[in-house]
Amino acid sequence: MIKLYQFDELRPEEILNRDIRAEKNVEDVVDGILADVRARGDAALKEYALKFDGASIEELQVTQAEIDEAFANMDPYFLETLKEAAANIEAFHRQQVHKNFVMNDKPGVVLGQKYTPIEKAGVYVPGGTAAYPSTVLMDVIPAKVAGVSEIVMTTPAGKDGRVNPVILAAAATAGVTKIFKTGGAQAVAALAYGTESIPAVDKIVGPGNIYVATAKRKVFGKVGIDMIAGPSEILVLADGGCDPAWVAADLLSQAEHDKLASPVLVTDSEALAKAVQAELEVQIPQLPRAAIARASVDDNGKIIVCTDLHKAIEACNIIAPEHLEVCVEDPFGVLNEIKNAGSIFLGRNVPEALGDYFAGPNHTLPTSGTARFSSPLGVDDFVKKSSFLYYTRDALEVVAPRIADFAEREGLHAHARSVTIRYE
Protein backbone atom coordinates (compact mmCIF):
# COMPACT_ATOMS: atom_id res chain seq x y z
CA MET A 1 0.00 0.00 0.00
CA ILE A 2 1.17 3.53 -0.76
CA LYS A 3 2.64 5.28 2.27
CA LEU A 4 1.06 8.40 3.77
CA TYR A 5 3.13 11.19 5.36
CA GLN A 6 2.62 14.57 7.00
CA PHE A 7 4.67 17.25 5.21
CA ASP A 8 5.77 19.03 8.39
CA GLU A 9 7.22 15.79 9.77
CA LEU A 10 9.38 15.01 6.71
CA ARG A 11 13.01 15.96 6.21
CA PRO A 12 13.90 17.23 2.69
CA GLU A 13 15.69 14.01 1.80
CA GLU A 14 12.59 12.03 2.79
CA ILE A 15 10.44 14.22 0.54
CA LEU A 16 12.68 13.57 -2.46
CA ASN A 17 13.24 9.80 -2.02
CA ARG A 18 15.33 9.36 -5.15
CA ASP A 19 17.88 6.86 -3.95
CA ILE A 20 18.02 4.90 -7.22
CA ARG A 21 21.26 2.95 -7.62
CA ALA A 22 22.56 1.44 -10.83
CA GLU A 23 23.98 -2.06 -10.90
CA LYS A 24 27.68 -2.06 -10.11
CA ASN A 25 28.69 -3.63 -13.40
CA VAL A 26 26.80 -1.20 -15.65
CA GLU A 27 29.76 1.16 -16.08
CA ASP A 28 32.11 -1.65 -17.09
CA VAL A 29 29.61 -3.21 -19.48
CA VAL A 30 28.95 0.12 -21.19
CA ASP A 31 32.65 0.93 -21.45
CA GLY A 32 33.20 -2.38 -23.21
CA ILE A 33 30.33 -1.85 -25.64
CA LEU A 34 31.44 1.69 -26.52
CA ALA A 35 34.99 0.54 -27.22
CA ASP A 36 33.82 -2.47 -29.23
CA VAL A 37 31.48 -0.50 -31.49
CA ARG A 38 34.11 2.18 -31.98
CA ALA A 39 36.60 -0.47 -33.09
CA ARG A 40 34.41 -2.89 -35.09
CA GLY A 41 31.46 -0.79 -36.24
CA ASP A 42 28.59 -2.59 -37.98
CA ALA A 43 29.91 -6.06 -37.13
CA ALA A 44 29.68 -5.31 -33.42
CA LEU A 45 26.16 -3.90 -33.79
CA LYS A 46 24.95 -7.04 -35.53
CA GLU A 47 26.47 -9.25 -32.85
CA TYR A 48 24.83 -7.26 -30.08
CA ALA A 49 21.47 -7.39 -31.88
CA LEU A 50 21.68 -11.18 -31.83
CA LYS A 51 22.97 -11.32 -28.25
CA PHE A 52 20.56 -8.86 -26.60
CA ASP A 53 17.52 -8.82 -28.90
CA GLY A 54 17.65 -12.28 -30.48
CA ALA A 55 17.59 -10.57 -33.88
CA SER A 56 19.63 -11.69 -36.87
CA ILE A 57 20.28 -8.50 -38.86
CA GLU A 58 21.65 -8.50 -42.40
CA GLU A 59 21.20 -4.81 -43.22
CA LEU A 60 21.11 -2.31 -40.38
CA GLN A 61 19.25 0.40 -42.28
CA VAL A 62 15.48 0.11 -42.59
CA THR A 63 14.47 0.08 -46.25
CA GLN A 64 11.80 2.21 -47.89
CA ALA A 65 9.94 -1.02 -48.69
CA GLU A 66 9.71 -1.80 -44.96
CA ILE A 67 8.35 1.69 -44.27
CA ASP A 68 5.82 1.40 -47.10
CA GLU A 69 4.68 -1.98 -45.78
CA ALA A 70 4.22 -0.52 -42.29
CA PHE A 71 1.95 2.20 -43.69
CA ALA A 72 0.00 -0.25 -45.85
CA ASN A 73 -0.81 -2.49 -42.89
CA MET A 74 -1.48 0.26 -40.34
CA ASP A 75 -4.92 0.87 -38.85
CA PRO A 76 -6.22 3.96 -40.73
CA TYR A 77 -7.71 5.38 -37.53
CA PHE A 78 -4.33 5.24 -35.80
CA LEU A 79 -2.61 6.81 -38.82
CA GLU A 80 -5.00 9.74 -38.53
CA THR A 81 -4.25 9.92 -34.81
CA LEU A 82 -0.52 10.03 -35.55
CA LYS A 83 -1.00 12.82 -38.07
CA GLU A 84 -3.17 14.89 -35.74
CA ALA A 85 -0.79 14.44 -32.82
CA ALA A 86 2.16 15.35 -35.06
CA ALA A 87 0.38 18.51 -36.20
CA ASN A 88 -0.28 19.54 -32.59
CA ILE A 89 3.34 18.91 -31.60
CA GLU A 90 4.65 20.84 -34.60
CA ALA A 91 2.36 23.82 -33.97
CA PHE A 92 3.46 24.06 -30.34
CA HIS A 93 7.16 23.80 -31.13
CA ARG A 94 6.98 26.39 -33.89
CA GLN A 95 6.23 28.89 -31.14
CA GLN A 96 9.68 28.12 -29.69
CA VAL A 97 11.64 29.22 -32.77
CA HIS A 98 13.94 32.14 -31.97
CA LYS A 99 14.64 35.10 -34.21
CA ASN A 100 18.10 36.50 -34.91
CA PHE A 101 18.70 40.02 -33.66
CA VAL A 102 21.00 42.92 -34.61
CA MET A 103 22.00 45.97 -32.55
CA ASN A 104 23.41 49.03 -34.35
CA ASP A 105 22.70 51.86 -31.93
CA LYS A 106 26.32 53.09 -31.81
CA PRO A 107 28.12 54.68 -34.79
CA GLY A 108 30.22 52.16 -36.70
CA VAL A 109 29.20 49.23 -34.48
CA VAL A 110 27.06 46.21 -35.40
CA LEU A 111 26.35 43.53 -32.78
CA GLY A 112 24.02 40.58 -33.05
CA GLN A 113 23.12 36.98 -32.44
CA LYS A 114 22.14 34.31 -34.92
CA TYR A 115 20.67 30.85 -34.51
CA THR A 116 21.91 27.89 -36.53
CA PRO A 117 20.44 24.36 -36.45
CA ILE A 118 22.79 21.50 -35.72
CA GLU A 119 23.50 19.46 -38.84
CA LYS A 120 22.87 15.89 -37.65
CA ALA A 121 20.68 14.70 -34.77
CA GLY A 122 20.45 11.15 -33.47
CA VAL A 123 17.17 10.00 -31.93
CA TYR A 124 17.15 6.90 -29.73
CA VAL A 125 13.79 5.13 -29.49
CA PRO A 126 13.48 2.29 -26.95
CA GLY A 127 12.24 -1.16 -27.89
CA GLY A 128 11.63 -3.94 -25.42
CA THR A 129 8.17 -4.98 -24.25
CA ALA A 130 6.34 -1.92 -25.61
CA ALA A 131 6.45 0.33 -28.67
CA TYR A 132 6.60 4.08 -28.15
CA PRO A 133 5.55 5.95 -31.30
CA SER A 134 4.86 8.99 -29.10
CA THR A 135 8.58 9.18 -28.30
CA VAL A 136 9.35 9.27 -32.01
CA LEU A 137 7.03 12.24 -32.57
CA MET A 138 8.19 14.13 -29.50
CA ASP A 139 11.91 13.74 -30.20
CA VAL A 140 11.92 14.12 -33.98
CA ILE A 141 9.47 16.96 -34.63
CA PRO A 142 11.36 19.63 -32.62
CA ALA A 143 14.50 18.75 -34.60
CA LYS A 144 12.58 19.09 -37.84
CA VAL A 145 11.12 22.44 -36.77
CA ALA A 146 14.60 23.63 -35.77
CA GLY A 147 15.85 22.92 -39.29
CA VAL A 148 18.10 19.92 -38.64
CA SER A 149 19.02 18.58 -42.08
CA GLU A 150 19.69 14.94 -41.12
CA ILE A 151 17.73 13.11 -38.41
CA VAL A 152 19.01 9.59 -37.75
CA MET A 153 16.90 7.24 -35.64
CA THR A 154 17.98 4.01 -33.96
CA THR A 155 15.66 1.45 -32.41
CA PRO A 156 16.01 -2.27 -31.65
CA ALA A 157 14.60 -4.84 -34.04
CA GLY A 158 12.39 -7.68 -32.87
CA LYS A 159 13.40 -11.32 -33.04
CA ASP A 160 12.17 -11.37 -36.64
CA GLY A 161 14.76 -8.75 -37.55
CA ARG A 162 12.11 -6.11 -38.22
CA VAL A 163 11.24 -2.84 -36.50
CA ASN A 164 7.75 -2.50 -35.05
CA PRO A 165 5.60 -1.06 -37.88
CA VAL A 166 4.00 1.47 -35.52
CA ILE A 167 7.47 2.93 -34.88
CA LEU A 168 8.19 3.07 -38.62
CA ALA A 169 4.90 4.83 -39.35
CA ALA A 170 5.58 7.39 -36.62
CA ALA A 171 9.12 7.96 -37.88
CA ALA A 172 7.98 8.58 -41.44
CA THR A 173 5.18 10.86 -40.22
CA ALA A 174 7.61 12.88 -38.11
CA GLY A 175 10.23 13.25 -40.85
CA VAL A 176 13.11 10.95 -39.92
CA THR A 177 15.87 10.83 -42.55
CA LYS A 178 17.32 7.36 -41.81
CA ILE A 179 16.31 4.52 -39.48
CA PHE A 180 18.67 1.85 -38.17
CA LYS A 181 18.01 -1.45 -36.40
CA THR A 182 20.13 -1.16 -33.29
CA GLY A 183 19.42 -0.41 -29.65
CA GLY A 184 21.00 -0.16 -26.23
CA ALA A 185 24.38 1.33 -25.42
CA GLN A 186 25.63 0.05 -28.78
CA ALA A 187 23.23 2.37 -30.62
CA VAL A 188 24.49 5.34 -28.61
CA ALA A 189 28.06 4.36 -29.52
CA ALA A 190 27.16 4.15 -33.20
CA LEU A 191 25.54 7.58 -33.17
CA ALA A 192 28.46 9.12 -31.31
CA TYR A 193 31.36 7.57 -33.24
CA GLY A 194 29.78 6.48 -36.52
CA THR A 195 30.07 3.10 -38.24
CA GLU A 196 30.20 1.96 -41.86
CA SER A 197 26.41 2.35 -42.08
CA ILE A 198 25.47 4.84 -39.38
CA PRO A 199 26.69 8.44 -39.59
CA ALA A 200 28.12 10.11 -36.50
CA VAL A 201 25.76 12.83 -35.29
CA ASP A 202 26.19 16.09 -33.42
CA LYS A 203 23.65 15.42 -30.67
CA ILE A 204 21.81 12.38 -29.28
CA VAL A 205 18.34 12.63 -27.74
CA GLY A 206 15.81 10.14 -26.46
CA PRO A 207 15.10 8.00 -23.38
CA GLY A 208 16.39 4.54 -22.60
CA ASN A 209 17.30 2.12 -19.84
CA ILE A 210 20.24 2.49 -17.44
CA TYR A 211 22.67 1.22 -20.09
CA VAL A 212 21.49 3.80 -22.62
CA ALA A 213 21.59 6.58 -20.02
CA THR A 214 25.10 5.60 -18.94
CA ALA A 215 26.29 5.46 -22.54
CA LYS A 216 24.87 8.92 -23.23
CA ARG A 217 26.67 10.29 -20.20
CA LYS A 218 29.95 8.74 -21.31
CA VAL A 219 29.83 10.05 -24.90
CA PHE A 220 28.85 13.56 -23.81
CA GLY A 221 31.57 15.90 -24.99
CA LYS A 222 32.12 13.93 -28.17
CA VAL A 223 28.49 14.73 -28.94
CA GLY A 224 25.78 16.71 -27.22
CA ILE A 225 22.96 14.98 -25.35
CA ASP A 226 19.53 16.13 -24.24
CA MET A 227 19.51 14.85 -20.66
CA ILE A 228 20.10 11.80 -18.49
CA ALA A 229 16.57 10.57 -17.95
CA GLY A 230 15.70 8.65 -14.81
CA PRO A 231 12.55 6.67 -13.99
CA SER A 232 9.23 8.33 -14.77
CA GLU A 233 7.58 10.57 -12.17
CA ILE A 234 4.14 12.03 -11.60
CA LEU A 235 3.09 14.37 -8.82
CA VAL A 236 -0.59 15.15 -8.44
CA LEU A 237 -1.31 18.32 -6.46
CA ALA A 238 -4.95 17.92 -5.44
CA ASP A 239 -7.39 19.68 -3.15
CA GLY A 240 -10.37 18.18 -1.37
CA GLY A 241 -12.67 18.75 -4.33
CA CYS A 242 -11.01 16.08 -6.47
CA ASP A 243 -12.46 12.68 -7.31
CA PRO A 244 -10.17 10.12 -5.61
CA ALA A 245 -10.75 7.61 -8.42
CA TRP A 246 -9.44 10.13 -10.96
CA VAL A 247 -6.41 10.92 -8.83
CA ALA A 248 -5.60 7.23 -8.37
CA ALA A 249 -5.94 6.59 -12.10
CA ASP A 250 -3.56 9.46 -12.85
CA LEU A 251 -0.97 8.15 -10.39
CA LEU A 252 -1.17 4.71 -11.97
CA SER A 253 -0.68 6.13 -15.46
CA GLN A 254 2.99 6.52 -14.53
CA ALA A 255 3.28 3.66 -12.06
CA GLU A 256 2.61 1.15 -14.86
CA HIS A 257 5.72 2.37 -16.73
CA ASP A 258 8.39 0.95 -14.46
CA LYS A 259 8.89 -0.55 -11.01
CA LEU A 260 11.15 2.43 -10.30
CA ALA A 261 8.54 5.01 -11.36
CA SER A 262 7.54 7.51 -8.69
CA PRO A 263 3.80 8.30 -8.21
CA VAL A 264 3.22 11.02 -5.59
CA LEU A 265 0.10 12.77 -4.32
CA VAL A 266 0.44 16.07 -2.45
CA THR A 267 -2.77 17.36 -0.91
CA ASP A 268 -4.17 19.64 1.76
CA SER A 269 -7.00 17.16 2.42
CA GLU A 270 -6.52 14.22 4.80
CA ALA A 271 -9.84 12.81 3.61
CA LEU A 272 -8.73 12.81 -0.03
CA ALA A 273 -5.40 11.25 0.94
CA LYS A 274 -7.08 8.29 2.61
CA ALA A 275 -9.64 7.92 -0.17
CA VAL A 276 -6.91 7.80 -2.84
CA GLN A 277 -4.95 5.32 -0.74
CA ALA A 278 -7.99 3.03 -0.74
CA GLU A 279 -8.81 3.63 -4.41
CA LEU A 280 -5.31 2.57 -5.50
CA GLU A 281 -5.93 -0.81 -3.88
CA VAL A 282 -9.10 -1.14 -5.97
CA GLN A 283 -7.55 -0.11 -9.29
CA ILE A 284 -4.13 -1.78 -9.22
CA PRO A 285 -5.43 -5.38 -9.54
CA GLN A 286 -7.45 -4.35 -12.60
CA LEU A 287 -4.35 -3.33 -14.59
CA PRO A 288 -2.66 -5.63 -17.15
CA ARG A 289 0.67 -4.36 -15.74
CA ALA A 290 -0.47 -4.74 -12.15
CA ALA A 291 2.80 -6.24 -10.87
CA ILE A 292 4.82 -3.29 -12.17
CA ALA A 293 2.32 -0.75 -10.84
CA ARG A 294 2.23 -2.49 -7.46
CA ALA A 295 6.01 -2.34 -7.08
CA SER A 296 6.09 1.31 -8.13
CA VAL A 297 3.33 2.36 -5.73
CA ASP A 298 4.57 0.36 -2.75
CA ASP A 299 8.29 1.09 -3.12
CA ASN A 300 8.42 4.59 -4.59
CA GLY A 301 4.96 6.07 -4.15
CA LYS A 302 3.88 8.40 -1.39
CA ILE A 303 1.04 10.63 -0.30
CA ILE A 304 2.07 13.85 1.44
CA VAL A 305 -0.55 15.72 3.45
CA CYS A 306 0.02 19.45 3.99
CA THR A 307 -1.71 21.96 6.24
CA ASP A 308 -2.69 24.22 3.34
CA LEU A 309 -2.33 24.65 -0.42
CA HIS A 310 0.70 26.94 -0.17
CA LYS A 311 2.56 24.30 1.85
CA ALA A 312 1.54 21.75 -0.76
CA ILE A 313 3.05 23.91 -3.52
CA GLU A 314 6.22 24.23 -1.42
CA ALA A 315 6.45 20.44 -1.38
CA CYS A 316 5.99 20.34 -5.16
CA ASN A 317 8.83 22.81 -5.67
CA ILE A 318 11.13 20.74 -3.47
CA ILE A 319 10.36 17.57 -5.43
CA ALA A 320 10.62 19.31 -8.85
CA PRO A 321 8.69 16.53 -10.61
CA GLU A 322 8.78 15.46 -14.23
CA HIS A 323 4.97 15.70 -14.54
CA LEU A 324 2.93 17.93 -12.22
CA GLU A 325 -0.86 17.78 -12.31
CA VAL A 326 -2.45 20.80 -10.61
CA CYS A 327 -5.90 19.47 -9.74
CA VAL A 328 -7.24 22.37 -7.70
CA GLU A 329 -10.21 24.72 -7.98
CA ASP A 330 -8.20 27.62 -9.49
CA PRO A 331 -5.12 26.15 -11.22
CA PHE A 332 -4.18 29.39 -12.98
CA GLY A 333 -4.29 31.17 -9.63
CA VAL A 334 -1.38 29.09 -8.33
CA LEU A 335 0.57 28.69 -11.58
CA ASN A 336 3.07 31.42 -10.78
CA GLU A 337 3.85 29.83 -7.41
CA ILE A 338 5.08 26.69 -9.17
CA LYS A 339 8.81 27.10 -9.81
CA ASN A 340 10.09 23.58 -10.48
CA ALA A 341 8.33 21.14 -12.81
CA GLY A 342 9.02 19.60 -16.20
CA SER A 343 5.46 19.92 -17.51
CA ILE A 344 2.47 21.38 -15.68
CA PHE A 345 -1.04 20.01 -16.30
CA LEU A 346 -3.61 22.58 -15.21
CA GLY A 347 -7.05 21.55 -13.98
CA ARG A 348 -8.99 18.40 -13.25
CA ASN A 349 -9.65 17.55 -16.90
CA VAL A 350 -6.00 17.37 -17.98
CA PRO A 351 -4.65 13.86 -17.31
CA GLU A 352 -0.96 13.36 -17.88
CA ALA A 353 -1.72 11.05 -20.84
CA LEU A 354 -3.04 14.07 -22.76
CA GLY A 355 0.44 15.56 -22.74
CA ASP A 356 2.13 12.22 -23.33
CA TYR A 357 0.47 11.70 -26.68
CA PHE A 358 -1.49 14.49 -28.14
CA ALA A 359 -1.69 18.06 -26.87
CA GLY A 360 1.59 19.38 -28.28
CA PRO A 361 4.02 20.21 -25.44
CA ASN A 362 6.94 17.82 -25.31
CA HIS A 363 6.88 14.73 -23.10
CA THR A 364 10.66 14.28 -22.96
CA LEU A 365 11.09 15.95 -19.58
CA PRO A 366 13.69 16.42 -16.84
CA THR A 367 13.51 13.83 -14.06
CA SER A 368 15.12 13.18 -10.67
CA GLY A 369 14.73 16.78 -9.51
CA THR A 370 16.58 18.23 -12.50
CA ALA A 371 13.55 20.38 -13.32
CA ARG A 372 15.16 22.77 -10.82
CA PHE A 373 17.64 23.73 -13.55
CA SER A 374 16.63 22.12 -16.84
CA SER A 375 13.75 22.11 -19.29
CA PRO A 376 11.69 19.85 -21.55
CA LEU A 377 13.11 18.84 -24.91
CA GLY A 378 12.39 21.48 -27.51
CA VAL A 379 13.63 23.44 -30.48
CA ASP A 380 16.39 24.96 -28.32
CA ASP A 381 17.99 21.52 -28.06
CA PHE A 382 18.62 21.45 -31.80
CA VAL A 383 19.98 24.94 -32.42
CA LYS A 384 23.15 26.80 -31.52
CA LYS A 385 23.41 30.53 -31.03
CA SER A 386 26.43 32.52 -32.18
CA SER A 387 27.12 36.14 -31.38
CA PHE A 388 28.69 38.39 -34.03
CA LEU A 389 30.29 41.83 -33.90
CA TYR A 390 31.56 44.39 -36.39
CA TYR A 391 33.44 47.66 -35.74
CA THR A 392 34.68 50.19 -38.28
CA ARG A 393 38.24 51.47 -37.90
CA ASP A 394 36.99 54.71 -36.38
CA ALA A 395 34.69 52.92 -33.94
CA LEU A 396 37.52 50.68 -32.72
CA GLU A 397 39.83 53.67 -32.31
CA VAL A 398 37.37 55.32 -29.91
CA VAL A 399 37.49 52.37 -27.46
CA ALA A 400 41.03 51.11 -28.15
CA PRO A 401 42.64 52.78 -25.09
CA ARG A 402 40.07 51.23 -22.76
CA ILE A 403 40.50 47.76 -24.29
CA ALA A 404 44.29 47.99 -24.03
CA ASP A 405 44.08 49.17 -20.42
CA PHE A 406 41.70 46.32 -19.54
CA ALA A 407 43.99 43.71 -21.14
CA GLU A 408 47.14 45.01 -19.47
CA ARG A 409 45.48 44.94 -16.04
CA GLU A 410 44.91 41.22 -16.64
CA GLY A 411 48.56 40.80 -17.65
CA LEU A 412 47.62 39.95 -21.24
CA HIS A 413 49.84 42.32 -23.15
CA ALA A 414 49.45 40.57 -26.50
CA HIS A 415 45.73 41.22 -26.23
CA ALA A 416 46.43 44.92 -25.78
CA ARG A 417 48.97 44.95 -28.62
CA SER A 418 46.44 43.37 -31.03
CA VAL A 419 44.39 46.56 -30.64
CA THR A 420 47.03 49.28 -30.45
CA ILE A 421 49.08 47.97 -33.40
CA ARG A 422 46.26 49.02 -35.72
CA TYR A 423 46.86 52.68 -34.91
CA GLU A 424 50.65 52.92 -34.98
Where on the chain are the PLM-derived regions?
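Conserved small-residue-rich beta-alpha loop and adjacent elements
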Residues: M103-A169
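C-terminal core of ALDH-fold dehydrogenases
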Residues: I318-E424
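A conserved active-site cap/scaffold subdomain adjacent to cofactor or substrate pockets
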Residues: M227-D299, I303
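N-terminal Rossmann-like NAD(P)+-binding subdomain of aldehyde/semialdehyde dehydrogenases
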Residues: M1-E119
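Alpha-helix C-terminal capping segments
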Residues: M138-S149, A172-A174, A192-I198, K216-K218, ...
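Conserved NAD(P)+-binding/catalytic subdomain of aldehyde/semialdehyde dehydrogenases
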Residues: G175-W246, D250-S253, H257-S262
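Short internal beta-strands
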Residues: S149-K159, P263-E270, V276, G347
